[in-house]
Protein backbone atom coordinates (compact mmCIF):
# COMPACT_ATOMS: atom_id res chain seq x y z
CA UNK A 1 0.00 0.00 0.00
CA UNK A 2 1.14 3.58 -0.56
CA UNK A 3 1.99 6.02 2.24
CA UNK A 4 -1.46 7.60 2.52
CA UNK A 5 -3.20 4.23 2.55
CA UNK A 6 -0.82 3.04 5.25
CA UNK A 7 -1.50 6.15 7.36
CA UNK A 8 -5.26 5.69 7.07
CA UNK A 9 -4.98 2.07 8.20
CA UNK A 10 -2.71 3.06 11.10
CA UNK A 11 -5.22 5.68 12.24
CA UNK A 12 -7.91 3.00 12.57
CA UNK A 13 -6.16 1.39 15.53
CA UNK A 14 -7.70 2.60 18.80
CA UNK A 15 -4.29 2.82 20.40
CA UNK A 16 -5.07 4.92 23.46
CA UNK A 17 -2.13 4.89 25.90
CA UNK A 18 -0.81 2.35 26.78
CA UNK A 19 -2.71 -0.03 24.46
CA UNK A 20 -1.20 -0.35 20.98
CA UNK A 21 -4.35 -2.20 19.76
CA UNK A 22 -2.25 -4.18 17.26
CA UNK A 23 -0.61 -1.15 15.62
CA UNK A 24 2.93 -2.36 16.34
CA UNK A 25 2.27 -5.73 14.69
CA UNK A 26 0.79 -3.93 11.71
CA UNK A 27 3.96 -1.85 11.29
CA UNK A 28 6.21 -4.88 11.69
CA UNK A 29 4.32 -6.67 8.92
CA UNK A 30 4.74 -3.67 6.61
CA UNK A 31 8.53 -3.79 7.12
CA UNK A 32 8.95 -7.55 6.99
CA UNK A 33 12.52 -7.26 5.70
CA UNK A 34 13.58 -5.62 8.99
CA UNK A 35 14.42 -7.65 12.09
CA UNK A 36 11.63 -7.18 14.62
CA UNK A 37 12.16 -7.19 18.37
CA UNK A 38 9.07 -6.79 20.54
CA UNK A 39 10.32 -5.40 23.83
CA UNK A 40 7.81 -5.41 26.67
CA UNK A 41 8.38 -3.90 30.10
CA UNK A 42 5.82 -3.59 32.91
CA UNK A 43 3.08 -4.43 30.43
CA UNK A 44 4.12 -1.72 27.95
CA UNK A 45 4.61 -2.89 24.36
CA UNK A 46 7.47 -1.52 22.29
CA UNK A 47 8.94 -2.44 18.93
CA UNK A 48 12.44 -2.19 17.51
CA UNK A 49 12.77 -2.70 13.77
CA UNK A 50 16.34 -2.78 12.51
CA UNK A 51 18.17 -3.61 9.30
CA UNK A 52 21.91 -3.96 8.75
CA UNK A 53 23.20 -2.78 5.38
CA UNK A 54 26.95 -3.15 5.93
CA UNK A 55 29.52 -3.68 8.69
CA UNK A 56 31.08 -0.23 8.80
CA UNK A 57 29.28 3.09 8.84
CA UNK A 58 26.70 5.05 10.72
CA UNK A 59 23.52 3.92 12.41
CA UNK A 60 20.49 6.16 11.84
CA UNK A 61 17.26 5.68 13.78
CA UNK A 62 13.75 7.07 13.68
CA UNK A 63 11.67 7.27 16.82
CA UNK A 64 7.96 7.61 17.39
CA UNK A 65 4.87 6.53 19.29
CA UNK A 66 1.68 4.86 18.14
CA UNK A 67 -0.29 5.68 21.28
CA UNK A 68 -2.71 8.59 21.34
CA UNK A 69 -4.65 10.53 23.94
CA UNK A 70 -8.35 9.69 24.40
CA UNK A 71 -10.67 11.19 21.80
CA UNK A 72 -13.33 12.50 24.15
CA UNK A 73 -16.70 13.84 23.06
CA UNK A 74 -17.63 16.36 20.38
CA UNK A 75 -16.05 14.88 17.26
CA UNK A 76 -17.77 15.34 13.91
CA UNK A 77 -17.03 11.70 13.10
CA UNK A 78 -15.71 8.60 14.84
CA UNK A 79 -12.18 9.57 15.91
CA UNK A 80 -10.86 6.15 14.90
CA UNK A 81 -12.62 5.99 11.53
CA UNK A 82 -10.42 8.31 9.43
CA UNK A 83 -12.23 10.74 7.15
CA UNK A 84 -10.57 12.36 4.13
CA UNK A 85 -12.03 15.78 3.41
CA UNK A 86 -10.83 18.87 1.54
CA UNK A 87 -7.16 17.91 1.61
CA UNK A 88 -7.08 16.70 5.22
CA UNK A 89 -7.36 13.38 7.03
CA UNK A 90 -9.37 13.63 10.26
CA UNK A 91 -8.67 11.15 13.08
CA UNK A 92 -7.16 10.99 16.54
CA UNK A 93 -3.39 10.77 16.13
CA UNK A 94 -3.41 12.31 12.65
CA UNK A 95 -0.86 14.93 13.72
CA UNK A 96 0.37 13.44 17.00
CA UNK A 97 1.96 11.37 15.71
CA UNK A 98 0.83 8.61 13.39
CA UNK A 99 1.57 10.80 10.37
CA UNK A 100 5.19 10.97 11.50
CA UNK A 101 5.36 7.21 12.01
CA UNK A 102 3.76 6.49 8.63
CA UNK A 103 6.14 8.93 6.95
CA UNK A 104 9.32 7.30 8.22
CA UNK A 105 7.95 3.81 7.55
CA UNK A 106 7.38 4.87 3.94
CA UNK A 107 10.81 6.51 3.77
CA UNK A 108 12.79 3.50 4.99
CA UNK A 109 10.87 1.29 2.52
CA UNK A 110 11.73 3.42 -0.49
CA UNK A 111 15.03 5.16 0.24
CA UNK A 112 18.49 4.01 -0.83
CA UNK A 113 20.48 4.08 2.42
CA UNK A 114 24.27 4.15 2.21
CA UNK A 115 25.01 3.79 5.92
CA UNK A 116 25.48 0.71 8.09
CA UNK A 117 22.13 0.31 9.86
CA UNK A 118 18.62 1.76 9.93
CA UNK A 119 16.36 1.34 12.95
CA UNK A 120 12.83 2.29 13.95
CA UNK A 121 12.06 2.64 17.65
CA UNK A 122 8.35 2.59 18.41
CA UNK A 123 6.40 2.69 21.66
CA UNK A 124 2.83 2.73 22.95
CA UNK A 125 3.83 4.67 26.08
CA UNK A 126 4.61 8.27 25.18
CA UNK A 127 1.40 10.11 26.00
CA UNK A 128 1.34 8.58 29.50
CA UNK A 129 4.15 8.29 32.01
CA UNK A 130 6.62 7.38 29.25
CA UNK A 131 8.80 5.38 31.63
CA UNK A 132 8.72 1.94 30.01
CA UNK A 133 8.64 2.97 26.36
CA UNK A 134 11.44 4.49 24.31
CA UNK A 135 13.69 4.53 27.36
CA UNK A 136 13.30 0.76 27.78
CA UNK A 137 14.12 0.11 24.11
CA UNK A 138 17.26 2.25 24.26
CA UNK A 139 18.32 0.45 27.44
CA UNK A 140 17.82 -2.87 25.63
CA UNK A 141 19.87 -1.62 22.67
CA UNK A 142 22.66 -0.35 24.90
CA UNK A 143 22.98 -3.76 26.55
CA UNK A 144 23.57 -5.24 23.09
CA UNK A 145 25.86 -2.48 21.81
CA UNK A 146 23.22 -1.46 19.26
CA UNK A 147 22.63 2.19 20.10
CA UNK A 148 22.23 4.45 17.05
CA UNK A 149 24.60 7.30 16.30
CA UNK A 150 21.83 9.66 15.22
CA UNK A 151 18.07 9.79 15.56
CA UNK A 152 15.04 11.65 14.25
CA UNK A 153 11.88 11.78 16.36
CA UNK A 154 8.94 12.54 14.10
CA UNK A 155 6.90 14.63 16.54
CA UNK A 156 4.74 17.38 14.98
CA UNK A 157 7.14 20.31 15.26
CA UNK A 158 5.93 22.79 12.67
CA UNK A 159 3.78 25.78 13.56
CA UNK A 160 2.19 27.37 10.49
CA UNK A 161 3.49 25.31 7.58
CA UNK A 162 5.58 22.23 7.00
CA UNK A 163 9.26 23.09 7.15
CA UNK A 164 9.14 26.10 9.47
CA UNK A 165 10.58 24.41 12.57
CA UNK A 166 13.13 21.77 13.58
CA UNK A 167 13.63 21.04 17.25
CA UNK A 168 17.26 20.61 18.22
CA UNK A 169 16.66 20.29 21.95
CA UNK A 170 14.08 20.52 24.67
CA UNK A 171 13.79 22.24 28.01
CA UNK A 172 13.68 20.11 31.11
CA UNK A 173 10.82 20.11 33.59
CA UNK A 174 11.08 20.58 37.36
CA UNK A 175 7.96 20.26 39.51
CA UNK A 176 7.79 21.91 42.91
CA UNK A 177 5.51 21.65 45.94
CA UNK A 178 5.81 24.22 48.72
CA UNK A 179 4.03 23.97 52.07
CA UNK A 180 3.98 27.01 54.37
CA UNK A 181 2.99 26.09 57.91
CA UNK A 182 1.00 28.38 60.18
CA UNK A 183 -1.29 28.18 63.18
CA UNK A 184 -5.04 28.14 62.71
CA UNK A 185 -7.21 30.47 64.77
CA UNK A 186 -10.18 32.81 65.03
CA UNK A 187 -10.09 35.66 62.54
CA UNK A 188 -11.05 38.13 65.30
CA UNK A 189 -7.82 37.35 67.16
CA UNK A 190 -5.08 37.54 64.49
CA UNK A 191 -2.45 38.11 67.16
CA UNK A 192 -3.06 34.56 68.40
CA UNK A 193 -2.67 33.03 64.92
CA UNK A 194 0.19 32.44 62.55
CA UNK A 195 -1.32 33.21 59.17
CA UNK A 196 0.74 31.48 56.46
CA UNK A 197 -0.91 33.55 53.72
CA UNK A 198 0.20 36.79 55.34
CA UNK A 199 3.67 35.40 56.00
CA UNK A 200 4.07 34.23 52.41
CA UNK A 201 2.59 37.30 50.71
CA UNK A 202 5.90 39.23 50.44
CA UNK A 203 7.60 36.09 49.10
CA UNK A 204 5.02 35.44 46.40
CA UNK A 205 6.16 38.33 44.23
CA UNK A 206 9.73 36.98 44.42
CA UNK A 207 8.60 33.55 43.25
CA UNK A 208 5.87 34.07 40.66
CA UNK A 209 7.27 34.49 37.16
CA UNK A 210 10.88 34.75 38.33
CA UNK A 211 13.55 34.00 35.72
CA UNK A 212 16.25 31.78 37.19
CA UNK A 213 18.55 32.46 34.24
CA UNK A 214 18.59 35.02 31.42
CA UNK A 215 18.07 32.47 28.66
CA UNK A 216 20.26 32.01 25.60
CA UNK A 217 20.12 31.87 21.83
CA UNK A 218 18.69 28.35 22.07
CA UNK A 219 16.62 28.49 25.27
CA UNK A 220 14.14 30.90 26.79
CA UNK A 221 14.71 31.82 30.46
CA UNK A 222 13.99 29.18 33.09
CA UNK A 223 10.88 30.73 34.62
CA UNK A 224 9.05 29.76 37.81
CA UNK A 225 5.38 29.33 36.91
CA UNK A 226 2.88 28.86 39.73
CA UNK A 227 0.23 26.28 38.86
CA UNK A 228 -1.78 26.03 42.07
CA UNK A 229 -2.13 27.86 45.38
CA UNK A 230 -4.60 27.21 48.18
CA UNK A 231 -5.13 27.55 51.92
CA UNK A 232 -7.93 27.70 54.45
CA UNK A 233 -11.33 26.05 54.60
CA UNK A 234 -13.37 28.40 52.41
CA UNK A 235 -14.82 30.21 55.41
CA UNK A 236 -14.41 33.82 56.52
CA UNK A 237 -13.88 33.41 60.26
CA UNK A 238 -10.98 30.93 60.49
CA UNK A 239 -7.39 31.66 59.47
CA UNK A 240 -5.54 28.95 57.48
CA UNK A 241 -3.39 26.38 59.18
CA UNK A 242 -1.15 26.09 56.13
CA UNK A 243 -0.70 27.31 52.57
CA UNK A 244 0.02 24.89 49.73
CA UNK A 245 1.59 25.97 46.48
CA UNK A 246 2.63 24.09 43.34
CA UNK A 247 4.89 25.35 40.56
CA UNK A 248 6.80 24.24 37.50
CA UNK A 249 10.07 25.34 35.92
CA UNK A 250 10.78 24.52 32.28
CA UNK A 251 14.52 24.70 32.68
CA UNK A 252 17.41 25.18 30.30
CA UNK A 253 20.75 23.41 30.86
CA UNK A 254 21.85 26.59 32.70
CA UNK A 255 19.45 25.96 35.60
CA UNK A 256 19.48 22.79 37.69
CA UNK A 257 17.20 21.41 40.36
CA UNK A 258 19.78 22.54 42.92
CA UNK A 259 19.56 26.09 41.54
CA UNK A 260 15.79 26.06 42.04
CA UNK A 261 16.21 24.68 45.56
CA UNK A 262 18.76 27.32 46.51
CA UNK A 263 16.60 30.18 45.25
CA UNK A 264 13.44 29.00 47.02
CA UNK A 265 15.35 28.43 50.24
CA UNK A 266 16.77 31.95 50.04
CA UNK A 267 13.44 33.72 49.56
CA UNK A 268 11.65 31.53 52.13
CA UNK A 269 14.26 32.09 54.84
CA UNK A 270 12.53 32.60 58.18
CA UNK A 271 9.32 30.82 57.20
CA UNK A 272 8.21 27.45 58.51
CA UNK A 273 8.05 25.54 55.24
CA UNK A 274 8.62 22.26 53.45
CA UNK A 275 9.87 22.05 49.86
CA UNK A 276 9.59 19.08 47.50
CA UNK A 277 11.23 19.17 44.06
CA UNK A 278 11.25 16.58 41.29
CA UNK A 279 12.98 16.66 37.90
CA UNK A 280 10.56 14.92 35.54
CA UNK A 281 12.71 15.41 32.44
CA UNK A 282 16.21 16.65 31.63
CA UNK A 283 17.07 19.48 29.26
CA UNK A 284 19.21 18.69 26.23
CA UNK A 285 20.62 20.38 23.15
CA UNK A 286 22.06 19.00 19.92
CA UNK A 287 24.70 21.35 18.52
CA UNK A 288 23.66 23.10 15.31
CA UNK A 289 26.94 22.00 13.72
CA UNK A 290 26.15 18.33 14.31
CA UNK A 291 25.60 16.19 11.22
CA UNK A 292 21.98 15.28 12.04
CA UNK A 293 21.02 18.95 12.40
CA UNK A 294 22.80 19.94 9.21
CA UNK A 295 21.40 17.09 7.11
CA UNK A 296 17.86 17.54 8.40
CA UNK A 297 18.06 21.26 7.70
CA UNK A 298 19.23 20.57 4.14
CA UNK A 299 16.47 18.04 3.44
CA UNK A 300 13.75 20.27 4.89
CA UNK A 301 14.83 23.25 2.79
CA UNK A 302 15.20 21.12 -0.34
CA UNK A 303 11.73 19.55 -0.12
CA UNK A 304 9.62 22.27 1.52
CA UNK A 305 11.47 25.39 0.27
CA UNK A 306 11.24 26.79 3.80
CA UNK A 307 14.07 27.92 6.07
CA UNK A 308 13.31 26.22 9.38
CA UNK A 309 13.80 27.80 12.77
CA UNK A 310 16.10 25.64 14.88
CA UNK A 311 14.56 25.82 18.34
CA UNK A 312 13.86 24.15 21.67
CA UNK A 313 10.30 25.39 22.22
CA UNK A 314 7.42 23.37 23.60
CA UNK A 315 7.07 20.61 26.14
CA UNK A 316 8.93 17.37 26.64
CA UNK A 317 9.19 14.41 24.26
CA UNK A 318 10.92 11.05 23.97
CA UNK A 319 13.83 12.79 22.24
CA UNK A 320 15.19 13.41 25.74
CA UNK A 321 15.83 9.70 26.15
CA UNK A 322 17.90 9.50 22.96
CA UNK A 323 19.98 12.43 24.22
CA UNK A 324 20.42 10.77 27.62
CA UNK A 325 21.91 7.72 25.90
CA UNK A 326 24.35 9.88 23.93
CA UNK A 327 22.44 9.75 20.63
CA UNK A 328 22.46 13.00 18.64
CA UNK A 329 18.81 13.74 18.00
CA UNK A 330 16.48 16.20 16.27
CA UNK A 331 12.71 16.34 15.91
CA UNK A 332 10.75 17.13 12.77
CA UNK A 333 7.18 16.52 11.71
CA UNK A 334 3.95 18.04 10.45
CA UNK A 335 2.17 21.07 11.94
CA UNK A 336 0.84 20.84 15.49
CA UNK A 337 -2.18 23.16 15.42
CA UNK A 338 -4.71 20.37 16.11
CA UNK A 339 -2.79 18.03 18.41
CA UNK A 340 -4.89 16.59 21.27
CA UNK A 341 -7.87 18.57 19.93
CA UNK A 342 -11.37 17.63 18.82
CA UNK A 343 -11.38 16.86 15.07
CA UNK A 344 -7.60 16.45 14.96
CA UNK A 345 -6.46 16.45 11.35
CA UNK A 346 -3.36 16.38 9.17
CA UNK A 347 -2.81 18.01 5.80
CA UNK A 348 -2.26 15.38 3.12
CA UNK A 349 0.15 17.72 1.34
CA UNK A 350 2.18 18.17 4.53
CA UNK A 351 2.25 14.42 5.11
CA UNK A 352 3.47 13.72 1.58
CA UNK A 353 6.21 16.33 1.96
CA UNK A 354 7.24 14.76 5.27
CA UNK A 355 7.65 11.40 3.52
CA UNK A 356 9.92 13.05 0.96
CA UNK A 357 11.94 14.90 3.63
CA UNK A 358 12.69 11.66 5.46
CA UNK A 359 13.50 9.83 2.23
CA UNK A 360 15.90 12.60 1.19
CA UNK A 361 17.53 12.59 4.62
CA UNK A 362 18.13 8.84 4.48
CA UNK A 363 19.55 8.93 0.96
CA UNK A 364 21.89 11.85 1.64
CA UNK A 365 23.02 10.97 5.15
Swiss-Prot record:
PANTHER family xref list: ACETYLORNITHINE DEACETYLASE, N-ACETYL-L-CITRULLINE DEACETYLASE
EC class (word): hydrolase
Gene Ontology biological process terms, A to Z: diaminopimelate biosynthetic process; L-arginine biosynthetic process; lysine biosynthetic process via diaminopimelate
Purpose of the protein: Catalyzes the hydrolysis of N-succinyl-L,L-diaminopimelic acid (SDAP), forming succinate and LL-2,6-diaminopimelate (DAP), an intermediate involved in the bacterial biosynthesis of lysine and meso-diaminopimelic acid, an essential component of bacterial cell walls.
Keyword annotations of the record: Amino-acid biosynthesis, Cobalt, Diaminopimelate biosynthesis, Hydrolase, Lysine biosynthesis, Metal-binding, Zinc
Record note on cofactor: Binds 2 Zn(2+) or Co(2+) ions per subunit.
Name used for this protein in its record: Succinyl-diaminopimelate desuccinylase
Binding site for Zn(2+) 1: 65, 96, 155
GO terms assigned for molecular function: acetylornithine deacetylase activity; metal ion binding; succinyl-diaminopimelate desuccinylase activity
Source organism of the structure: Campylobacter jejuni subsp. jejuni serotype O:23/36 (strain 81-176)
Source taxon at top rank: Bacteria
Stored CDD domains: M20_DapE_proteobac
Co-factor requirement: Zn(2+); Co(2+)
Binding locations of Zn(2+) 2: 96, 127, 340
Active site as annotated: 67, 126
Pfam families linked to this entry: M20_dimer, Peptidase_M20
Amino acid sequence: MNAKEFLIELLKFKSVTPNDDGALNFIAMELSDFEAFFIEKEGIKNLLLTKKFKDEGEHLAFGGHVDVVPAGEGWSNNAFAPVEKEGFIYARGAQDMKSGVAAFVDAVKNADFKGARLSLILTSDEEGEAIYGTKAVLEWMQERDMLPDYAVVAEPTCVKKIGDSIKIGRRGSINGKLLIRGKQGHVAYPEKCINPVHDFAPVLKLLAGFDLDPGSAEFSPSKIVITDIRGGMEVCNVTPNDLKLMFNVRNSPDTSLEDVKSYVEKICHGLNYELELKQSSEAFLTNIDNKIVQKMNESVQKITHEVPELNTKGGTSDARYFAKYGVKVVEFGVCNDRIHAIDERVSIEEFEKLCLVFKDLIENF
